[in-house]
Curated annotation (Swiss-Prot):
The lineage of its organism: Eukaryota, Fungi, Dikarya, Ascomycota, Pezizomycotina. Phospholipid scramblase involved in autophagy and cytoplasm to vacuole transport (Cvt) vesicle formation. Cycles between the preautophagosomal structure/phagophore assembly site (PAS) and the cytoplasmic vesicle pool and supplies membrane for the growing autophagosome. Lipid scramblase activity plays a key role in preautophagosomal structure/phagophore assembly by distributing the phospholipids that arrive through atg2 from the cytoplasmic to the luminal leaflet of the bilayer, thereby driving autophagosomal membrane expansion. Required for mitophagy. It is a multi-pass membrane protein. Residues 158-181 have a biased composition (Basic and acidic residues). It comes from Sclerotinia sclerotiorum (strain ATCC 18683 / 1980 / Ss-1) (White mold). Residues 87-97, 844-855 have a biased composition (Basic residues). It catalyses: a 1,2-diacyl-sn-glycero-3-phosphocholine(in) = a 1,2-diacyl-sn-glycero-3-phosphocholine(out); a 1,2-diacyl-sn-glycero-3-phospho-L-serine(in) = a 1,2-diacyl-sn-glycero-3-phospho-L-serine(out); a 1,2-diacyl-sn-glycero-3-phosphoethanolamine(in) = a 1,2-diacyl-sn-glycero-3-phosphoethanolamine(out); a 1,2-diacyl-sn-glycero-3-phospho-(1D-myo-inositol-3-phosphate)(in) = a 1,2-diacyl-sn-glycero-3-phospho-(1D-myo-inositol-3-phosphate)(out). One of its GO terms (biological process) is lipid transport. Its main location: membrane. This is Autophagy-related protein 9. Residues 907-916 have a biased composition (Acidic residues). Residues 70-86, 190-199, 776-789, 813-823 have a biased composition (Polar residues). Forms a homotrimer with a solvated central pore, which is connected laterally to the cytosol through the cavity within each protomer. Acts as a lipid scramblase that uses its central pore to function: the central pore opens laterally to accommodate lipid headgroups, thereby enabling lipid flipping and redistribution of lipids added to the outer leaflet of atg9-containing vesicles, thereby enabling growth into autophagosomes. Residues 70-113, 142-199, 753-881, 894-922 are annotated as: Disordered.
């Protein structure tokens, strides 16, 4: 409807049909073939390269072009003609080379992200679907004509047994899933009694219903979005209560505003004719409401009914999600307010590995769509973040690369960027809804150079139409926002005038600070921790002139208030009957001068405050991860302070700018943003990549964990060319996002060390691993064994992280010594997404001493790559000192590495009483051990 309205109001394309018709026709023609990589048939099965075809049961002979099921995987009597690579099933003859020529960014795919087609297992209930004549005809056509089979089933049985043996051997080597008898205790599995679908509702136990819905999920983006919304809302009852309160707030604002504006005769109050409210009320005021007010009231009523309808329709979905959390993830609704999202991901991955089957009844067209972009095999922390932030990652990149023009050519604005929540809503509708289709994927037509001009014109028309709609809706939005803000904050400012000086980050600053694949609750947590340091930084720049004036005004206001208060206490009648000025009693001036004193007193800096702007700003950067290049060596300057002040403003000014932006947003949509249409279309074409099983995502959001942050060394390298600058992020956004992702999902938030492994899995690893970057010493293994890390108390089982026993899962991929062989690896990442083991060991050391290390550095802590353990600027651990262990290892707490758990149980208490221990190894350590052995149990003085 919106597209048709746009095409009618705005000039149409005279050269051909509308771009919306082209997009719609292209989407319908593509259908399930929207997966370019699946049509290309060029996926490499790197996981099975070391196995021969006969070991895998000859998958090339048994896998058809449409589907793979357990029941049809090894029908050896059906020989099929192999299909040529690059051939399009639609008959168009387009291969992979043609598709990649249209979208060069697809060349940057990582073959490690490909999910082998031979590993996708589906339901074995194939006979539930009766074969249609078309299926029988297609199967007969695919089978070559042959002579009748030799009578006797013996040869066929032998061949089936051989194929079954090959398949069982492949399952044993690949560890796709465990059988019911070998499945770990506590891991949920597919119930034996599948609920029956009667057409209107499911019959069976709640757990069976939840499992049936999970198995039949076809749109993982919507499902993961509902799951995250349920997690953020803290359960069904909190979500319902929040929605009800929002509706009641809207109703109260509408009723109270109507009462104040239409049902009260203020003239009677001013003349003194009305001694009480009942005399000032307008009789039958609802019949005297004007036409525009009636229209507004009816619109509000319709909107309230729409919100109530939304709430009622959301209840079944919320109840299904509650069953999913309760019965499959084993998270009760009472624990939703305290459970972490990392624990939810761990349970979801365990559920995925315990039930590696897709939907049972699915058409071939839908199978292409599900396995191409909605594969449940791609469901670790990295893939979930890409699904949840598929659109937000593009907006983060747009703001980082400064593609959007948010300025107006007005002299008094001086090129200032204007951004607000209102403009954000318009950008989401104009850009994201235009680029993404109904399935949440980037339209393939956007990725083609041939339609660049039409797409740019269509985007410009959307900007113009959005500006027109903002002009129509601006008066209503302004009135509603002002009324709600007045009702919400006036009493707070009246009771606490100092709250007028409170600050907050602007919407533009939030998009500049947010990083790729950083979920909303994690970003808010990081941002909230920076508020005290940001306020402290701005207080590091006191204006001496302002401070002197504030002291003088504070002194005068305090003197007047003190005299009036003393006079009132001396004679209470003065407060009621004495007027200082005409119709202004004593109480009025006490309030005025008291508020003035509170405001000016807040401008006076503390006398005992230490001024160090550079140190204070580094503390802010520690959490915001934002440090432009031009801030280098200028953190103490006033220019940096003014620039930071535009990002961290007074909340009152943020509200004023929000109201002002409602008025100027149409001008931005009419004059500034249409100039960026070509760059926006080019951006989506150049920075979109395809990930098998996930779909189209922003290229910056695909972290290459094998290569680290992807930054080349800056020392000894010439200045990067224009192409590298174009295809890279600014201000080190990519590297900051990569390391922040590791901090959130590689490190356990409860313990501060890598790994989310459950206790049962952690205790299985007794030998100490080799951590190349943990201690810069040739004897790091011996140092680790004798340090506190090996002598800490054994973690009690009841203090384990909130991860169920079902998290002990069998890996779906071949064993990887660097990823899964070490307990430092995170269980929230699949083997393909595990960073190198050297980075795992060094990450905890860098994180614990990061702030001190940054304070010593004089350059950007985010832009520069992490130095090597023995690189310049990093202290080298020496044998005679224990700071490397005491600062980074001794405080690991409960999730420390146990070299010998049995011995730690017996001797842990005695060793802790003896002090710091040997301190690692070396001559001094041996001397200390010898001295301790000689004096143990005898009186004497320790020489250590």
């Amino acid at each position: 409807m919106a597209s048709n309205l746009i095409s009618r109001l705005l000039p149409s394309n005279t050269q051909g049909r509308s771009i919306y018709d082209s997009l719609r026709a292209h989407d319908e023609a593509s259908g399930s073939d929207m997966d370019v990589e699946e049509r290309a048939a060029m996926a490499i099965d790197e996981e099975n390269l070391r196995f021969k075809d006969d070991e895998l049961g000859n998958p090339a002979d048994v896998i058809s072009g449409e589907s793979v099921t357990e029941s049809t995987a090894f029908l050896s009597d059906q020989q099929q003609t192999p299909q040529k690579q690059g051939y399009n099933r639609k008959g168009k003859g387009k291969g992979r080379s043609h598709n990649l020529a249209e979208s060069p960014r697809l060349l940057e795919e990582d073959s490690d992200d490909d999910v082998p087609a031979s590993l996708l297992i589906e339901g074995n209930n194939r006979h539930a679907d009766p074969e249609t004549p078309n299926h029988i005809r297609a199967r007969q056509t695919a089978l070559p004509k042959r002579a009748p089979a030799v009578p006797g089933p013996s040869a066929q049985q032998i061949k089936e047994e051989r194929d079954r043996a090959h398949w069982e051997m492949t399952q044993e080597q690949q560890k796709l899933h465990e059988d019911g008898g070998n499945r770990a205790t506590g891991v949920p599995h597919t119930p034996q009694s599948i609920p029956q679908n009667t057409g209107f509702y499911l019959t069976g136990s709640p757990k069976d219903k939840a499992m049936y819905r999970w198995v039949n999920v076809t749109n993982l983006d919507n499902f993961i979005g509902d799951l995250y919304a349920y997690f953020e809302g803290a359960g069904i009852w909190c979500i319902v209560l929040a929605k009800v309160i929002d509706i009641l707030t809207l109703v109260f604002v509408a009723v109270f505003t109507t009462f104040l504006t239409q049902c009260v005769d203020y003239k009677k109050i001013y003349r003194g004719d009305a001694r009480s409210l009942e005399y000032a009320l307008v009789p039958q005021c609802t019949k005297k409401i004007s036409g525009m007010s009636n229209v507004a009231i009816w619109l509000v009523c319709l909107f309230v009914l729409y919100r109530v309808y939304q709430l009622l329709t959301d209840l079944p979905r919320l109840m299904k999600m509650r069953d999913f959390f309760t019965y499959l993830l084993e998270i009760q609704d009472s624990n939703m307010q305290t459970v972490s999202f990392q624990d939810v991901i761990a349970r979801l991955m365990a559920l995925r590995d315990a039930n590696p089957m897709t939907v049972e009844r699915i058409s071939p067209d839908n199978r292409k769509f599900v396995l191409g972009t909605q594969s449940k095999q791609r469901l670790d922390a990295h893939d979930i973040a890409n699904r949840l932030m598929r659109k937000e990652n593009y907006l983060i990149a747009l703001f980082n690369k400064e593609i959007l023009d948010l300025t107006l050519p007005l002299p008094f604005l001086q090129g200032r960027q204007l951004f607000s929540k209102t403009l954000q809503w318009n950008l989401e509708w104009c850009i994201l809804d235009f680029v993404f289709n109904d399935y949440g994927q980037v339209r393939q037509l956007v990725l083609k150079d041939s339609h660049r001009r039409e797409l740019s014109d269509g985007l410009r028309n959307r900007f113009l139409f959005a500006g027109l709609m903002n002009v129509i809706c601006a008066p209503v939005i302004v009135i509603y926002v002002v009324i709600v803000y007045f009702f919400k904050y006036f009493n707070q400012y009246h009771k606490n005038p100092a709250a007028l000086g409170s600050r907050g980050y602007t919407p533009l600053a939030e998009w500049k600070f947010r990083e790729f694949n950083e979920l909303h609750h994690l970003f808010n947590k990081r941002l909230n921790m920076s508020y005290p340091f940001a306020s402290r930084y701005l207080n590091q720049f006191p204006n001496v002139k302002t401070a002197h004036m504030a002291k003088f005004i504070t002194f005068m206001a305090g003197a007047v208030v003190s005299v009036l208060v003393v006079a009132t206490v001396w004679d209470s009648e003065v407060l009621a009957g004495f007027d200082i000025t005409s119709e202004r009693p004593v109480l009025f001036y006490i309030g005025v001068f008291g508020s003035l004193w509170a405001i000016t007193n807040g401008m006076i800096p503390e006398e005992n405050e230490v001024f160090d702007p550079e140190y204070a700003l580094r503390q802010v950067i520690e959490y915001t991860h934002y440090m432009p290049n031009h801030w280098q060596d200028r953190l103490h300057s006033d220019e940096v302070k003014r620039e930071f002040s535009t990002l961290y403003q007074l909340k009152l000014m943020i509200f004023i700018e929000e109201v002002f932006s409602i008025i100027i947003t149409p001008f931005l949509l009419w004059f500034s943003l249409p100039k960026c249409a070509d760059q926006i279309i080019d951006f989506f074409r150049e920075f979109t990549v395809h990930v098998d099983g996930v779909g189209y995502v922003c290229s910056f959001a695909v972290f290459d964990f094998k290569k680290g942050d992807g930054r080349a060394p800056t020392q000894g390298k010439a200045k990067s060319d224009m192409r590298e600058d174009y295809y890279s992020t600014k201000h080190g956004k990519m590297a900051a996002s990569y390391y922040n992702f590791l901090d959130n999902y590689l490190l356990n938030p409860k313990t501060g060390v890598p790994g989310h492994n459950p206790p049962g899995l952690r205790q299985q690893f007794y030998p100490p691993p080799a951590f190349p970057g943990l201690i810069s010493s040739p004897t790091s293994g011996a140092d680790l064994q004798s340090s506190r890390m090996g002598r800490s108390d054994v973690r009690p089982m009841n203090r384990a992280p909130y991860v169920p026993q079902q998290a002990v899962r069998t890996p779906r991929f071949p064993s990887n010594t660097t990823a899964t062989g070490s307990p430092m690896a995170s269980i929230l990442l699949d083997p393909r997404h595990q960073p190198p083991s050297s980075e795992l060991g060094a990450r905890s050391v860098r994180r614990s001493s990061r702030s001190r290390y940054q304070a010593r550095r004089g350059n950007n802590i985010i832009e520069d790559p992490m130095e090597d353990e023995n690189g310049p600027g990093r202290p080298v651990a020496q044998p005679g000192r224990s700071y490397a262990v005491d600062d980074t290892v001794a405080n690991l707490g409960e999730s420390t590495w146990e070299v010998s758990p049995a011995k730690a149980d017996a001797d842990g208490q005695d060793e802790e009483e003896d002090g710091d221990g040997t301190g690692g190894a070396g001559v001094l350590g041996l001397v200390y051990q010898f001295q301790k052995a000689q004096t143990n149990g005898r009186p004497g003085v320790s020489i250590w």
